[in-house]
Amino acid sequence: MAMNISNFFIKNIQKSIKFSRQYAKSTHPFTKTWSLINEEIKSGFKQQTDYPQHADVVIIGGGFIGSSVAYWLKTRAGEGLSVAVIEKDTAYEMSQNINSHGFITQHYSLPENIYLSQYSAEFLRNVKTHLNENVDIEYSPHGTLILASEKYAHKLEENVALQREYGVKNKILTGEEIQKMYPWLKTSDIKLGCISAESEGVFNAHNLLKGLILKSKELGTTYVKSEVIGFEMESQRDVLMEGVKPGSFNRINRLLYRTEDNEEISLRFAVCVVAAGTDSTHIAELANIGRGSDLLTVPLPVEKRTYNVYSIENEANKMSIGLNTPYIMDTSGLWLRRNGIQNNLICGLVPPLKVTDIPDSDIFHSSLHNRYPGCGESKIQTISTEYSDCNTYDDTGILGPHPYHTNMIFATGFSRQGVHHSPAIGKGVAELIIDCQYSTIDLSRFGFDRILIDEPLIEFNVY
């Protein structure tokens, strides 16, 4: 089903882009070697002196999704579209520790998520063609094993049947079969499992991020190390919009950002993409979303979730973790995967949708010792603390224009899926801006409207 986007949205996007054509010429050509750029990303961008005041599209957030949007916009439109990315953390400290994010799977119950995985897997396999020959994301294809208890076995079977309809090649296993394949796992409380081997695997997420940034800059995207502090609006009393009092509409057309020198600059734009991860709700509030009336009463329900990633060293127990060990998702929310060619595992818990009084470490250790009893003699240590942008409404990403600020497009709340789905999400946003509709994958159900009318879009998985 094709996405229905209002004529108001289409006309305003086209009109605004035409109006904003006169923009500052500020680009960052690809002139440094890969190693030098690598160090630049780690330490932050050089002091910026030329700050843009105009852009056709401004993207708030230069992480995986934001940089993917920039990449696809410039790939399709080239010099015909000016793109600026505002990122306050150009050292990407929030993205340095992303050990749990570098995986891709098709084990979903929503067709959109299956399609996002399939498209992104193809992008990752051909990343050197898309980005640069120097980009090495260390992609390692292997299967994902989903474990389901008696309670969730029926749901797993339903998911498997759906996935096969969309071309996913998978196989249902009994607990006994899983035990024979992976004797170090305890499966007495596992009813069924499902393993698949195509278009799934692990990769170096940080190298993917670097590659997206470098290519976006090479194509002409301007990255600005600054913090967004507000929006400017202009009254458009002639605009009539359902759910908005006549004569009260105010359109956002500028954002304010603060530079490293504490200078405040106003940037005029046609379209604003909010891909700010855990900061997205704050950005939305700056546009009065969640603080206004009528269509602005409902806030953006994206919150920060913090969780730990652990390493299990296996020298003590002599248990061999085979090289063919898949990425394992347990029914408890525990995940485990082999750490490259080393005989050890990295693991953690899927961040909960709702915060509870039970410490995550208690849940983790209980789940780990239940599924992997042999870890008792192993050294378990925390290797990183990571973050995700959790949509607390239904735990599914929010994508598309806001119903009031129709030139503000959200691309946030995807949690851990945001990394491996970022190539496809970025392409979808670029299609919205350039074509005013989704062309590759219909992602219209991910829109903000579902929150307004209280129709959650839930990914029914077994963990």
Regions found by a protein language model. Give the residues of each.
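Core beta-strand elements of the Rossmann-like FAD/NAD(P) dinucleotide-binding domain
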Residues: 53-55, 261-271
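Dinucleotide-binding Rossmann-like beta1-alpha1 core, especially the glycine-rich loop
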Residues: 101-181, 333
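Flavin (FAD/FMN) cofactor-binding and adjacent substrate-gating region
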Residues: 8-9, 30, 126, 148-226, ...
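Flavin (FAD/FMN) cofactor-binding core of flavoprotein oxidoreductases
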Residues: 164, 176-180, 202, 303, ...
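Glycine-rich Rossmann-fold phosphate-binding loop(s) that bind the pyrophosphate
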Residues: 61-63, 67
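Extreme N-terminal leader/targeting segments of oxidoreductases
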Residues: 2-56, 72-81
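Active-site substrate-recognition segment that forms the wall
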Residues: 71-72, 102-104, 126, 134-143, ...
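Glycine-rich FAD pyrophosphate-binding loop
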Residues: 74-97
